[in-house]
Amino acid sequence: MIYQKQRNTAETQLNISISDDQSPSHINTGVGFLNHMLTLFTFHSGLSLNIEAQGDIDVDDHHVTEDIGIVIGQLLLEMIKDKKHFVRYGTMYIPMDETLARVVVDISGRPYLSFNASLSKEKVGTFDTELVEEFFRAVVINARLTTHIDLIRGGNTHHEIEAIFKAFSRALGIALTATDDQRVPSSKGVIE
């Protein structure tokens, strides 16, 4: 199933769709480094993303990065509500040369982000690295996930961010994996 949403504000105009059919993705955020990270997200999560974004990137990349995270989170929440029968938990360690990242995801209905990643530099190219946390906070809060992101070792900032994105994507993909168990994956009987 394809989930689609538009978001139009004074700062951004977004048209985003997500599906779990692994169809080809098209990503145009206007921010080269973010395009690269979201391409990794699609490959490693098994999800398909189509993004057409325009924003005030002449100011900086903050609004478009955060707003894309908001919409991806909202679309993931719709997908989760429709799925009902999924593994729920996902954990992944990703090494990238000198770097090691760990991400743990719980599709809990309780939004929480622990972001423990001191990135080595403030920029990768023109991309402000502080936006990595802003992006994940937007996704996690809007998808109502509990997520722990830990950069265990680092060195090269590009590698650090790439390892985090890959680990999150793989952990999310595991958590979203369909299961034959017809019970809601919570002893409470509900995930809200």
From Swiss-Prot:
Note on cofactor: Binds 2 manganese ions per subunit.
EC number per UniProt: 4.2.1.19
List of residues binding Mn(2+) 1: 36, 63, 158, 162
InterPro entries membership: IGPD_sf, ImidazoleglycerolP_deHydtase, ImidazoleglycerP_deHydtase_CS, Ribosomal_Su5_D2-typ_SF
GO molecular function: imidazoleglycerol-phosphate dehydratase activity; metal ion binding
Signal peptide positions on this chain: none
Enzyme class: lyase
Entry's localization field: Cytoplasm
Reaction catalysis annotation: D-erythro-1-(imidazol-4-yl)glycerol 3-phosphate = 3-(imidazol-4-yl)-2-oxopropyl phosphate + H2O
Amino acids binding substrate: 11, 36-44, 62-66, 88, 110, 158-166, 186-188
Residues that coordinate or bind Mn(2+) 2: 62, 66, 134, 159
GO (cellular component) term, any one: cytoplasm
HAMAP family referenced in this protein's UniProt entry, alphabetically: HisB
The family this protein is said to belong to: Belongs to the imidazoleglycerol-phosphate dehydratase family.
Protein name in the entry: Imidazoleglycerol-phosphate dehydratase
Organism field: Staphylococcus aureus (strain N315)
Phylogenetic classification of the source organism: Bacteria, Bacillati, Bacillota, Bacilli, Bacillales
